[in-house]
Amino acid sequence: MNRRSERIWIEFIMGSRKTSNFCWACILLLGSLGFLLVGISSYLGRNLISLFPSQQINFFPQGIVMSFYGIAGLFISSYLWSTILWNIGSGYDRFDRKEGIVCIFRWGFPGINRRIFLRVFMGDIQSIRIEVKGGVYPRRVLYMDIRGQGSVPLTRTDENFTPREIEQKAAESAYFLRVPIEVF
């Protein structure tokens, strides 16, 4: 979702609250709970899951391994649910011609650097750069080159833009900021 006028352009960035992250977090949670229940049922010798008798799985070594996989899966799942809850990576890019300032804001992990805020003068922006990596999984990322500070990504590295979409986004950004486009 974008808000745009002649002087101000605000582009909202979607964070970790994507459908794919929800799906993976649910799959990991359910799968790891299943592994953990099978490991516990093999230890207790009872059927906690009625799909198969617990006597078919010995606690040593299969039950221990399944319990370990279940616990590891719960940790990974809790990490995914935490990133979804905190909405890591979300924020906005605000380009303000009137003030001559570009503000980039992102939410990070809780702690000292929870709020990531970068403020740059438009005069310090050298160019908008498109970086293209080919291969089986091509990657196209849009960067803003800033004098003295390096490059700042304007798009997520995991977004799969078509060449036309990334060119359109780069052209809009370069036109609004009045800077050239570079392709690498």
Swiss-Prot record:
Gene Ontology terms: biological process: photosynthesis
Main location: plastid
InterPro entries in alphabetical order: PSI_Ycf4_assembly
Name of the encoding gene: ycf4
Protein name: Photosystem I assembly protein Ycf4
GO CC annotation, single: photosystem I
Purpose: Seems to be required for the assembly of the photosystem I complex.
UniProt record similarity statement: Belongs to the Ycf4 family.
Organism listed in the record: Piper cenocladum
Entry membrane topology: Multi-pass membrane protein
Chain segments annotated as transmembrane: 22-42, 64-84
